[in-house]
Amino acid sequence: MPSIEAVGAREILDSRGNPTVEVEVVLEDGTLGRAAVPSGASTGAFEAVELRDGDNRYGGKGVTKAVAAVIDRIGPAIMELEATEQRLLDATLIDLDGTPGKSALGANALLGVSLAVAKAAAASSGLPLFRYLGGPTAHLLPVPMMNILNGGAHADTNVDIQEFMIAPIGASTFAESLRWGAEVYHALKSVLKARGLATGVGDEGGFAPSLPTNREALDLIAEGIDKAGFALGTDIALALDVASTEFYADGSYTFEGNSRSAEYLSDYYAELVSAYPIVSIEDPLAEDDWDGWVALTERLGGKVQLVGDDLFVTNPERLARGIALKAANALLVKVNQIGTLTETLDAVNLAHRSGYRAMMSHRSGETEDTTIADLAVAVDCGQIKTGAPARSERVAKYNQLLRIEEELDDAARYAGAAAFPRRRQAG
């Protein structure tokens, strides 16, 4: 396999108009791998560290330091490594940084290199990225968890829950699931218009109206599903990302204007799961509320998927702690939370070995990079969260999954309802 011959980087813009890092790696046979790094709005305290400039450019959010780290520090250190030696490459990156949170060179610098090398190696091998990473058996297309109504940190409104998602579990193919999701999205827009509600969109393409309660959002989506001609619960299920760390402080949660306990929220989620066909709840409790997580998982873990995002931050060590405590039952996978491809794959493998599900995810600050679409298929996630069927940085991932399904042809399998074995059956 060709070795690494050149490493370059540049500062580009993400979907929120903030700078991010793009890395290009060229191998000795001339093949190129390019990767752009995403960035989150609601970030966990335990995530790997993005290196930002902190000067006057771009309000302090420039990434010229991270770009320089790629060119001046990382490039020379990995020159002539074989591109297929991903684990060795990533270990080299981690050692070169030398800090627990990757704060010296920046997780944004390390991840850009890690992904660009993998993409170059795939190109050199003549394989699509999903096949290069997942091997000959990778064929499972994920259920798109479409965030069609935004609140929390993704929208400037009074809705606490950050994401209200639809999951087209009854579709027979990924292409059909994408069509169903798009049709519900447009139906929801007409429902909102008829109510005189705002139809502007948030960071991830979902609508962002101001609503009196969080349950009102679920009712509006249910109406949109019905208007589009689909059956709630059998054709299309619901999912939430509460992002509760965002409204947690000093041991309590400020929810719908009141100070609430973990026990109150647990009762609230139990009511929602009973009233609506909700298959997944992400970050229902805060990232350091371990006792609350354990109690909630014991109570609801047999009925609904409970996803740790801020809780686990795609970190195998934090995930191992959660598994030992029986906190949550699923892992959200965000490559930039941990900073290398190898560590991401290790986290997913640990989840699967331990009976936890895994959901591949974008960030609110995205680019046209489609790596996570391939990665979702490569690691058999069965679920992907990459926004509404709107805004091209979101749709880019969905379109890549369409291409993958087409390439797999008869071998393609759509995860569908099987992705959520804990779901409450409709009826």
From Swiss-Prot:
Record-level GO BP terms: glycolytic process
UniProt keyword list: Cytoplasm, Glycolysis, Lyase, Magnesium, Metal-binding, Secreted
Pathway(s) per entry: Carbohydrate degradation; glycolysis; pyruvate from D-glyceraldehyde 3-phosphate: step 4/5
UniProt key word Repressor: no
EC number: 4.2.1.11
Main subcellular location of this protein, as a coarse class: cytoplasm
Binding site for Mg(2+): D241, E282, D309
GO cellular component: cell surface; extracellular region; phosphopyruvate hydratase complex
GO MF terms, alphabetically ordered: magnesium ion binding; phosphopyruvate hydratase activity
Active site: E204, K334
Reaction catalysed by this enzyme: (2R)-2-phosphoglycerate = phosphoenolpyruvate + H2O
Function description: Catalyzes the reversible conversion of 2-phosphoglycerate (2-PG) into phosphoenolpyruvate (PEP). It is essential for the degradation of carbohydrates via glycolysis.
Database matches in PANTHER family: ENOLASE
Membership in a protein family: Belongs to the enolase family.
The protein, known as: Enolase
Organism: Frankia casuarinae (strain DSM 45818 / CECT 9043 / HFP020203 / CcI3)
